[in-house]
């Protein structure tokens, strides 16, 4: 397993300046933060460093300002939320390097915490400009990356800084890397993956990589329709990428060669209109979908069969819903299979790792987020990891 320095490797840091990359890209509505999950994820690292007497400077991006200052995207907007979660006073600094930051460090006492301005106000952040990284690094004694969600970006504060200062993985990053290693790096077999969502095109690399890594690939959501259509099934007016039939066929062939079983639903929930609890709703065999119907969820027989598959597995990776879960009753299959996975995890027979925005929402809907072994709040980074890609922000932390 790849080795990373963690906070356990830090010596005496009293009075030292910690540059800590966190994820403060928080959802806002009417100038208020609506979800502080990401702050809570970073809290153990921030408080551990502060309690050991470090001067903690938080680096983060917020929205997409494209290298220019926008007052509505200033990290000053999230200070109240950060203070609320940490239960500490937090200073805001409207710069990320230079004299203002130097003066702030002079004022801070060991254990104090400050949030620096939105790193993306500087064009050099996304360009991974070595000069910007050097200017930021000049104010720090060591660097901690606790933002796995931004680890797929090679930016100045996610990748560049790690080469200029002693670099460590924060507690959230450490937990994420451990869980991912457990899930696909060196998993207990058999391994199952659930991949759902609307389009095959957005998860093409994920599917291609997973068939070489897992024993069972369970495909749901609109993606399943594309695979069904490729096998000659009439999917009516369902969401379907008919032009990807050859691609779907190639994935079937790759799975066959790798000894991976691909599971598609054989009964489905259909309706003539996409609306909550539609009167035209019916459960049919997958070969009985009418031309004017659309598939909106997988059926109960398929869910039962998939539950039996999970009972034979030791590891599960989940990304994406099985149906149009935001609209009742098309959440039924997703919720049922999540609850099965949660029960198996509680019993100790399954290691379950899930990630991606829709997936987290589905887990919350099922009331099972706390029962999975690990739930990643990272979107793009989790997907790129599932694609087998090297993540620059993680690679930069490796001990070579």
Where are these regions (language model features)?
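Active-site loop-to-helix "anion-binding N-cap" substructures in soluble metabolic enzymes
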Residues: 1-400
């Amino acid at each position: 397993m790849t080795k990373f320095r963690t906070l356990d490797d830090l010596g005496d840091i009293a009075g030292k300046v910690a540059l800590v990359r966190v994820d403060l890209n928080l959802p806002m509505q009417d100038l208020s933060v609506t979800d502080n999950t990401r702050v809570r994820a970073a809290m153990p690292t921030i408080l551990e460093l502060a309690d050991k007497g470090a001067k903690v400077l938080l680096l983060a991006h917020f929205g997409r300002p494209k290298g220019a200052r926008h007052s509505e995207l200033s990290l000053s907007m999230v200070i109240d939320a950060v203070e609320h979660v940490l239960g500490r006073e937090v200073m805001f600094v409207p710069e990320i390097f230079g004299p203002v930051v130097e003066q702030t460090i002079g004022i801070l006492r060991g254990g104090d915490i400050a949030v620096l301005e939105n790193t993306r106000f500087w064009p050099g952040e996304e360009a991974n400009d070595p000069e910007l990284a050097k200017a930021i690094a000049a104010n720090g004694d060591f660097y901690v990356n606790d933002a796995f969600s931004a680890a797929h970006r090679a930016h100045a504060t996610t990748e560049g800084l790690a080469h200029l200062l002693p670099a460590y993985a924060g507690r959230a990053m450490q937990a994420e890397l451990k869980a991912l290693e457990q899930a696909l790096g060196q998993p207990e077999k058999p391994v199952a993956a659930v991949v759902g969502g609307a389009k095959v095109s957005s998860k093409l690399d994920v599917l291609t990589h997973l068939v070489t890594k897992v024993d069972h690939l369970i495909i749901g959501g609109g993606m399943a329709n594309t695979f069904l259509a490729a096998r000659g099934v009439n999917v009516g007016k369902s969401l379907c990428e008919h032009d990807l039939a050859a691609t779907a066929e190639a994935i079937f062939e790759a799975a066959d060669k790798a000894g991976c079983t691909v599971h598609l639903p054989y009964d489905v929930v259909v309706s003539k209109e996409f609306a909550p609890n539609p009167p035209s709703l019916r459960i049919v065999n997958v070969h009985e979908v009418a031309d004017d119907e659309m598939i909106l969820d997988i059926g109960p027989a398929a869910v039962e069969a998939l539950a039996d598959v999970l009972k034979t597995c030791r590891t599960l990776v989940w990304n994406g819903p099985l149906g149009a879960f935001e609209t009742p009753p098309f959440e039924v299959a997703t919720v049922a299979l999540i609850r099965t996975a949660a029960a198996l995890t509680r019993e100790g027979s399954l290691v379950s790792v899930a990630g991606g925005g829709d997936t987290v929402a589905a887990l919350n809907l099922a009331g099972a987020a706390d029962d999975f072994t690990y739930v990643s709040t990272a979107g793009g980074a989790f997907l790129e990891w599932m694609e087998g890609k090297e993540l620059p922000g993680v690679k930069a932390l490796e001990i070579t």
